[in-house]
């Protein structure tokens, strides 16, 4: 079984407005596909005769066997070897030409890519020159970019096995023949328009042959299943299996199809590019989640990172079922992110691309205390995990989450701890820490003396507790105080201002307490807030109060009885 895809008008489609004007009739496309099924041996090269050319001279210059000039004469129906008319056209079968072998250059290697077959040798590196027959395996996480000729490149994704087939040309006339055997995996080819119509660029899978003359075309193969996606240009597709009628169709720009064996699926329009406006252009974390909005019809996403906008230097390649991905495992640098959505047939849509700068080092430390949402009472420290090899830190505290209203900006801070300022008024604060660069650690992407600030944490400085003057009533002593609401408070009552032996020492809820009237004398009372984790605030200033001695009330005599006692005196 063999299927060949032939570029049908890619050069026209590269001109402005050509996409709307190019309407290849189905018959013409299928004819092209059928013609393409004939091997290179049946194809011809048309030579424009130059002044002074002869059949013998042309044969000596171009033919693999110069003695075939009489056959060339008969093919072109020429009567004798006389000087040919300048500007006339001479037909020459491609398999008569004198081909010379070319090489392909390894432009980029990511991860480990190894050669396959006899004499495979060490892992491949950039700059290697490859010849026809060289095979390779990108492994689970490797990627490879080959430069073939005149800007034509092919990028092979992870888990790809392929080999170079034909790599040849005819010197002096610009006829080239390139074939890549894609056994499994995926290839993304960018083919510059071939100058000579007799030139061929083919990628063959176990079931499909794709031939282009200048287009952006993606292929993937896994067993009998293959996927074909035309980004620019137009192609004709014919699937042929011995003993069966050919299956034929056409693919236009922004179309794709899925083939199973020789059976070609119905062409469908590729999904549009995703919206990458929400992808950050600057990343300051070694692991950063990125995402795109869901896309109608999408059932998967293909993410790639490269060091160049053309994606010839592929660094990462991964697929996810959801429109989110984690960028990680990259050194600081400038990168390009590319994502495309895949439909139910796993046909991948148009690219969406976003450049970003990764500036994540030196990494900020992890904040330990106060944690986000914590309450602070009394003297407290800000504490963070100590980063390895960190010479010092920069600490910022602000009243706002954007750190525009700073109350503290201190550097260098040596060690993983800094005391809070006791003068900060009650309220909410935000704090964060950055690691300073070591001396001489200014790399090519270092910006300033420090790395990025870490994620900030929010804490609240609670107001101090204040004890109100106690009120002594006939039913006891009434205590009230002000302080942070929603917390318990500890109350101490003592007869000495040192509170060495308090008569009352308990934690109570709320901001009010009623006690029985103690024995007469002087007393001192104070309070402190108690947080749920057991931490306590500062003691309030003690309040002193006096419980007076009890005074005997005068006796009361009945007035009538008093008058009776006074009668004898009258």
For the regions a language model picked out, list residue spans one by one.
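Extracellular LysM carbohydrate-binding repeats and other cell-envelope/extracellular binding modules
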Residues: 61-101
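Short beta-strand segments within Ig-like beta-sandwich modules, predominantly Fibronectin type-III
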Residues: 315-321, 408-414, 503-509
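Conserved aromatic anchor
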Residues: 288-297, 380-390, 477-486
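Primarily a LysM-type cell-wall glycan-binding module
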Residues: 41-63
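Extracellular fibronectin type III
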Residues: 345-358, 436-461, 533-547
């Amino acid at each position: 079984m063999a299927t060949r895809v032939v570029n049908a008008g890619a050069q026209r489609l590269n001109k402005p407005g050509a996409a709307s004007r190019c309407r290849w009739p189905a018959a013409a496309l299928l004819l092209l596909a059928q013609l393409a099924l004939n091997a290179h041996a049946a194809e011809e090269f048309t030579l424009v005769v130059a002044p002074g050319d002869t059949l013998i001279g042309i044969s000596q210059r171009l033919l693999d066997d110069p003695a075939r000039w009489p056959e060339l004469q008969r093919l072109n129906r020429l009567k004798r070897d006389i000087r040919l008319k300048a500007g006339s056209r001479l037909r020459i079968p491609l398999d008569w030409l004198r081909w010379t072998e070319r090489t392909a250059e390894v432009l980029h290697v990511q991860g480990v890519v190894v050669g396959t077959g006899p004499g495979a040798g060490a892992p491949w590196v950039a700059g290697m020159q490859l010849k026809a027959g060289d095979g390779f395996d990108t492994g689970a996480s490797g990627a490879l970019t080959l430069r073939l000729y005149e800007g034509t490149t092919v990028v092979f994704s992870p888990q790809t096995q392929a080999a170079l087939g034909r790599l040849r040309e005819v010197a002096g006339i610009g006829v080239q023949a390139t074939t890549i055997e894609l056994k499994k995996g995926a290839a993304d080819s960018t083919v510059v328009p071939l100058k000579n119509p007799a030139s061929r660029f083919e990628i063959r899978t176990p079931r499909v042959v794709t031939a282009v003359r200048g287009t952006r075309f993606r292929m993937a193969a896994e067993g009998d299943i293959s996927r074909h996606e035309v980004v620019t240009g137009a192609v004709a597709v014919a699937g042929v299996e011995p003993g069966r009628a050919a299956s034929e169709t056409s693919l236009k720009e922004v179309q794709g199809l899925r083939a199973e064996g020789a059976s070609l699926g119905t062409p469908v329009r590729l999904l549009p590019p995703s919206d990458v406006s929400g992808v950050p252009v600057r990343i300051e974390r070694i692991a950063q989640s990125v995402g795109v909005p869901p896309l109608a019809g999408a059932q998967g996403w293909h993410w790639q990172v490269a060091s160049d906008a053309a994606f010839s230097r592929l660094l990462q390649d991964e697929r996810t079922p959801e429109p989110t991905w984690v960028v990680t495992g990259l050194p600081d640098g400038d990168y390009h992110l590319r994502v495309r959505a895949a439909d139910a047939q796993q046909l991948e849509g148009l690219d969406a691309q976003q450049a970003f700068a990764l500036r994540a080092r030196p990494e900020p430390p992890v904040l330990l205390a106060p944690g986000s949402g914590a309450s602070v009472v009394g003297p407290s420290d800000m504490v963070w995990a100590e980063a390895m090899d960190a010479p010092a830190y920069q600490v910022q505290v602000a009243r706002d989450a954007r750190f525009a209203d700073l109350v503290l900006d201190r550097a260098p801070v040596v060690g993983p701890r800094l005391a809070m300022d006791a003068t900060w008024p009650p309220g909410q604060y935000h704090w964060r820490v950055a690691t300073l660069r070591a001396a001489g650690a200014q790399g090519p992407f270092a910006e300033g003396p420090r790395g990025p600030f870490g994620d900030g944490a929010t804490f609240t400085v609670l107001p101090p507790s204040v004890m109100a003057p106690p009120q002594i009533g006939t039913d006891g002593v009434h205590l009230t105080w002000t302080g942070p609401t929603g917390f318990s408070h500890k109350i101490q009552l003592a007869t000495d201002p040192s509170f060495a032996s308090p008569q009352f020492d308990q934690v109570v809820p709320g901001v009010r307490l009623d006690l029985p009237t103690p024995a007469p004398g002087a007393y001192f009372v104070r309070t402190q807030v108690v947080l749920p984790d057991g931490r306590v605030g500062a003691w309030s200033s003690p309040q002193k109060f006096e419980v007076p001695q009890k005074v005997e009330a005068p006796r009361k005599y009945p007035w009538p009885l008093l008058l009776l006692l006074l009668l004898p005196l009258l």
